[in-house]
């Protein structure tokens, strides 16, 4: 870290579950100075996040290229994946938002996202991101275009865009790893207050039914 996110950053330490992990940047930010400061602190790559504007993200890719830094992270919701690849994207995490790029109406839902990102309802960044995912993720998966997706994946491979799949995240709600006592035993390595919260939370969540969307997202991810 830190994550480099947009002005409506997700991890800003204000909402529960979203600690202070990010830097918020926009078109008015001196992005090169920010990148130089990260390099001075030992950064060897940049991790970008979903609420960056397309213009700011493309600017960061350009700066990173000049400084021989790879850029990885979540694909910003504001940009088409192919455009990001062509501009120098170096990696992706959790295959996040690949589903949006593989939909047969990818261009249409990109325009919808760009409109939503104007945030007419003044939502926090974390809530706005969740809203967009809820509106588009399963619509995109339902509109999967296999031929389009193969082209996108081949373009990722041809440009050496590495994947950090971390499929545990994508299947957490369907596979319910935390329902296993052996899994919960690993919480002993957490700070005491977190141990209790995680343990109670795991027990409670394990009682909930696996939703149809949980299974759909697992199948898509795997």
Predicted regions and their residues:
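Active-site environment of divalent metal-dependent phosphoester hydrolases
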Residues: 12-13, 48-58, 76-82, 98-101, ...
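Glycine-enriched alpha-helix->loop->beta-strand junction motifs that scaffold or abut catalytic
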Residues: 42, 63-69, 86-92, 160
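Short, acidic/polar
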Residues: 20-37, 75-82
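Metal-associated gating/positioning segment near the N- to mid-region
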Residues: 1, 15-20, 29, 82-88, ...
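Hydrophobic faces of well-ordered beta-strands that scaffold small-molecule active sites
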Residues: 4-8, 46-48, 71-73, 91-94, ...
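Alpha-helix-loop-beta-strand connector modules within alpha/beta enzyme cores
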Residues: 1-10, 57-74
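Active-site mouth loops of central-metabolism enzymes
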Residues: 15-30, 142, 214-215
């Amino acid at each position: 870290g830190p994550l480099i996110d947009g002005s409506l950053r997700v991890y800003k330490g204000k909402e529960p579950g979203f600690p202070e992990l990010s830097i918020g940047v926009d078109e008015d930010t001196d992005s090169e100075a920010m990148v130089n400061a990260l390099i001075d602190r030992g950064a060897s790559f940049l991790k970008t996040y979903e609420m960056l504007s397309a213009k700011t993200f493309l600017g960061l890719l350009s700066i990173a290229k000049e400084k021989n830094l790879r850029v990885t992270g979540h694909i910003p919701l504001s940009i088409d994946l192919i455009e990001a690849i062509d501009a120098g994207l170096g990696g992706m995490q959790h295959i996040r938002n690949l589903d949006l790029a593989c939909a047969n109406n990818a261009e249409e839902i990109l325009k919808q996202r760009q409109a939503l990102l104007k945030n007419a309802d003044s939502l926090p960044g974390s809530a706005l991101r969740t809203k967009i995912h809820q509106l588009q993720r399963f619509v995109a998966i339902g509109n999967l275009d296999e031929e389009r997706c193969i082209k996108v994946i081949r373009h990722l491979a041809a440009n050496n865009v590495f994947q950090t799949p971390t499929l545990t995240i994508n299947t957490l709600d369907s596979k319910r790893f935390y329902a296993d006592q052996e899994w919960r035993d690993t919480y002993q390595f957490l700070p005491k207050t977190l141990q209790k919260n995680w343990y109670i939370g795991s027990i409670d969540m394990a009682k909930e039914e696996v939703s149809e969307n949980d299974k759909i997202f697992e199948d898509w991810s795997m």
